[in-house]
Amino acid sequence: MFKFLVIVVFVFSFSFSNNDNVYSLISNPRNISIGKIHASIDNISNTFDSPILLNNNNNIYLSVDRYTNLYSVYYLSYCIYAKNQSNLLLGMVRREINNNFNTNSAWEDDGYPDLEDIDYTQIYNFSDKETGLLIAYNRLIDNNFIMGINFKPIFHRVDNISSIGFSFDVRYVIKMKKNQISFGIDNILAFKKWDSGLLEKFDLNGYLATAINISDRNIIFYEYNMANGSKLGLETKIIDNLFIRTGLNENDFTFGFGLQLKNIDLDYAYINNNSEIFTNNHSVGFNINLDN
């Protein structure tokens, strides 16, 4: 019955897609650089993107996404505990959109205004800040079959209006010798309740992804996501600790690199949005292992 329910919810999620919130963004620069794919890797940098298994507690992850001067997104993840069969992770995401202008009181809304009708003294700058707290529980259900559940409270303030919301995800990863399959159901029961009285709801979203090791040094990634369609990516190991990546989806061309050091992993992604508004963006992330 449980398996049937999972299949029904997953199929239903592919019928609707409208998920514009801070959790809808891919957080790991590695996954961004391969086309913004939910690729699974047992690293705390994947806390927001897919289920993971960890072998130690002392892992901290920090990343920053910079979208020109329009907005920035910050991610922080920490492992609360990690065992052979399960782990519990805590994450925080913060999106800040600055340099917004409120013109509601600058003129009377009776059509297109003449320049002399605009009172520029009534135009003021305001910010849009959204903060999410992620509680991720991952468990090994069977050999190479991982299940993850994400609980996602969210707080959002736009100018002088605030909201509080909640949603959760159910995600799975199946690992095989040379490839893996992952799929997820996101934004389950997602909503925001604004202090203005508005109840904002978000539709279910789903994805299905695969990664295939075509050689010892090359991995091909593919994902179909209801929000963004098809995505394709490639990761190549140049030397033991250096990786080059590239990806493509319907909106972006991406590439980047990864460098694995003794105590720190560094990942960088460059995003060409093909957009005059967002132009080209950058994402950088650090995974710090405190055990070594």
Regions found by a protein language model. Name each.
Residues F2-S15:
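Sec-dependent N-terminal signal peptides
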Residues N18-N292:
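Subset of outer-membrane beta-barrel
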